[in-house]
């Protein structure tokens, strides 16, 4: 049931990309509005992920997951019924917030529910769902857009969300961080949210609006960026980095004082945590980066349809679904370090091979 919630989050991050041309035609969107339909989801998701995860640890992870499912389903319905770009962007904002509620809740519930070998298998399934559904998203979006309407790319979340809500209610046990300190880290929340929004915005929009000198006008609704000689990306990035540095200093000071923190940076003192996150980041950059670029190349350069593009990406989903449980089995037998090393090597070979093949096809 939790896998269904994770699946909705990941699918919605990728399904819209192949539906955007149809959305632009149907709602008569400007290119700027279309860009915000995809961007706002990632911005809100990144901004609230840490904070909402901490709230779930304190108030109840199952409760947060159920609330996130409700928000996500309602916002999906609003997105599907949106009569104009403004309401669609607002619905996508709510979707990002709902996703930020669900993802940390599912991860914490898995960690609290399973032990030993079962935990490794559960995390393997959790990871395979993320990797697999990231590839299924374009296929599902292409089929729904081609066979029905782009609105069904959002409506599909309604039955899935209802089934997930019923399953979580019936089968998932409530859990909390019993050893957590009481209170809420407001300074940490503000600095982390501002920092993540600023940095993520800059990374997403830097190539579009220019990092320093503006290459196009930045607008939100009727509001226009007032500085003609400076892109909004540079100030956003500077504010984001400054806020994240402040977040680090605030969290370290609060931790030393014995006060509640949003994130314990002392965890990076553990080699397994530090290098595990580094490995996960490298894998995500490779897989998710390819999932963003490859559909654009297939459709814009090779002339593939949205559905055919999804079919090309389907083997990635199959491999991800099979790889999660298999990796858990091999990790128990040979040790996680060898499995991670082998997996990263396979991914490097695969991505390099795809790059060579695409260059030959393009020639």
Regions from the PLM with identified roles:
Residues 1-171, 323-327, 333-334, 338, ...:
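Transmembrane-helix bundle of Major Facilitator Superfamily
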Residues 1-45, 49, 149, 226-236, ...:
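Transmembrane core module of solute transporters
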Residues 20-23, 110, 144, 172, ...:
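Hydrophobic alpha-helical interface/terminus motif in multipass membrane transporters
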Residues 47, 101, 194-197, 289:
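Residue-level signal for the membrane-embedded core of alpha-helical transmembrane segments
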Residues 57, 99, 174, 205, ...:
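Acidic-residue sensor for enzyme active/binding pockets
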Residues 126, 146, 186, 211-215, ...:
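Juxtamembrane/interfacial segments around transmembrane helices
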Residues 146-278:
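Hydrophobic transmembrane-helix bundles of small-molecule transporters
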């Amino acid at each position: 049931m939790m896998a269904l919630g994770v699946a909705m989050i990941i699918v919605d991050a990728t399904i819209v990309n192949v539906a955007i041309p149809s959305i632009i035609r149907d709602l008569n969107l400007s290119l700027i509005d279309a860009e915000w339909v995809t961007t706002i989801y990632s911005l809100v998701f990144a901004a609230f992920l840490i904070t909402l995860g901490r709230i779930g640890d304190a108030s109840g992870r199952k409760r947060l997951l159920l609330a996130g499912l409700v928000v996500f389903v309602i916002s999906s319905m609003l997105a599907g019924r949106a009569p104009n770009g403004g309401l669609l962007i607002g619905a996508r904002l709510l979707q990002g917030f709902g996703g930020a509620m669900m993802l940390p809740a599912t991860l914490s519930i898995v960690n609290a529910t399973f032990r030993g070998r079962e935990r490794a298998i559960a995390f393997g399934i959790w990871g395979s769902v993320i990797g697999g559904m990231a590839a299924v998203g374009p296929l599902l979006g292409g089929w729904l857009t081609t066979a029905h309407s782009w609105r069904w790319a959002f409506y599909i979340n309604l039955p899935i969300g209802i089934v997930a809500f019923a399953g979580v209610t019936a089968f998932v046990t409530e859990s909390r961080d019993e050893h957590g300190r009481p209170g809420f880290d407001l300074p940490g929340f503000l600095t982390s949210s501002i920092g993540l929004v600023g940095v993520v915005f800059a990374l997403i929009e830097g190539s579009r609006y220019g990092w320093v000198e503006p290459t196009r006008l930045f607008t939100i609704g009727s509001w226009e960026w007032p500085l003609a000689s400076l892109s909004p990306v540079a100030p956003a990035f500077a504010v984001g980095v400054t806020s994240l540095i402040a977040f680090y200093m605030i969290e370290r000071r609060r931790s030393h004082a014995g006060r509640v923190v949003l994130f314990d940076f002392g965890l990076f003192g553990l080699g397994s945590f530090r290098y595990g996150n580094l490995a996960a980041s490298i894998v995500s950059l490779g897989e998710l980066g390819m999932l963003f670029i490859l559909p654009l190349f297939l459709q814009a350069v090779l002339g593939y349809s949205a559905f055919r593009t999804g079919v090309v990406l389907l083997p990635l989903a199959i491999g991800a679904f099979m790889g999660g449980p298999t990796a858990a089995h091999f990790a128990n037998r040979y040790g996680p370090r060898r499995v991670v090393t082998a997996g990263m090597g396979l991914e490097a070979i695969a991505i390099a091979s795809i790059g060579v093949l695409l260059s030959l096809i393009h020639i």
